[in-house]
Amino acid sequence: MRRIYLHIASIALCLFTVFSCSVKKNTKLSRSYQAMTTRYNVYFNGIENYKEQLKNMESNYEDNFTRLVHMHPVSAYGNPKETKPNGSFDRTIEKCQKAIKLHSIQKKPKRNQNKMHDPKYREYVKRGEFNPFIHNAWLLMGKAQFYKGDFLAASATFIYITRHFTW
């Protein structure tokens, strides 16, 4: 009988923890939980795909020695006569977008009036993003867009990163 109560209590504790860590709440526990699930679920799959596609792109690209040799295969996107490197970074971009959509915490935390005199705390409260790992997803998305050859989207992503994540 005691084991049954122990199992029920552990399941209830797990459910309570999972449901209390939503992106609509901004507590230390929810930030930690969202950062952990971002890092070890969606971001991990995105970074693994990124590494695989980058290795694919670098190994399959053949230089044309009758023309100017590029330092990196991405440089070939600038010349329409050059062979383009192949690498599908779409899955990486999708994973980053999923991480940002599902795990972004933009709700402001409850203000602690005792800490409002601290300049670091005031800067923290002014942030727009409170998941401590989301900036890595944005950076990976910008790099994937760059290696895909979508330079305008990559530059827009990098500008967004510099505006919102320079703390």
Task: Indicate residue ranges for each PLM-predicted region.
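Bacterial N-terminal signal peptides that target proteins for export
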Residues: 1-9
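Acidic, polar-rich low-complexity tracts and alpha-helical solenoid repeat scaffolds
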Residues: 2-3, 15, 21-167
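Hydrophobic alpha-helical targeting segments used for export or membrane insertion
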Residues: 9-17
